[in-house]
A protein has these predicted regions:
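Charged, amphipathic alpha-helical segments and their flanking helix caps
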Residues: 1-29, 77, 89-135
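Small/polar-rich, solvent-exposed N-terminal microdomains that initiate assembly or binding
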Residues: 1-86
């Protein structure tokens, strides 16, 4: 009934979202510091630090740091087009074969970006670099 396919659309979108925030830098005490970025919830990172079996071992978090995670997927009816509308695509393996495909179904992906900073000025520098990308 169904033909197997995997276009990696979700994976590519998650990577593109992370690329927006990769390489942010802040200025601290006259030197430029790169802000590390991780994929996954902040709570998981903090829980891993707290579950250290050696209680005498000092642990430290490198601050500032950012993390992001994919939190949800919802259908977006406002971008829906007619379900019978089709478009033609060429087969990537053989450029001569033309296939018809139905219009894709619109979904909205939700992400959460967390920023952990020791100083308020560090957080403001990060936010000021992020906000111009969004309306």
């Amino acid at each position: 009934m169904f033909e197997y396919f995997y276009n990696e659309i979700f994976r590519k979108t998650i990577i593109a979202f992370g690329t927006l925030f990769n390489g942010l830098e802040i200025q601290q005490e006259g030197s430029v510091t790169r802000v590390p970025l991780a994929y996954g919830p902040t709570q998981k990172f903090l829980a891993r630090i707290e579950q250290t079996p050696d209680l005498n071992k000092p642990t430290a978090i490198t601050l500032p740091r950012m993390s992001f995670e994919f939190t949800g997927l919802t259908y977006d009816a406002s971008r829906k087009v007619t379900t019978t509308q089709q478009f033609t695509v060429k087969d990537p393996t053989d450029g001569k074969i033309v296939k018809k495909a139905y219009m894709p179904v619109p979904y909205s992906m939700q992400f959460e970006l967390s920023i952990m900073c020791k100083l308020n000025d560090d957080a403001l520098q990060i936010v000021e670099q992020i906000l111009p990308y969004f309306q």
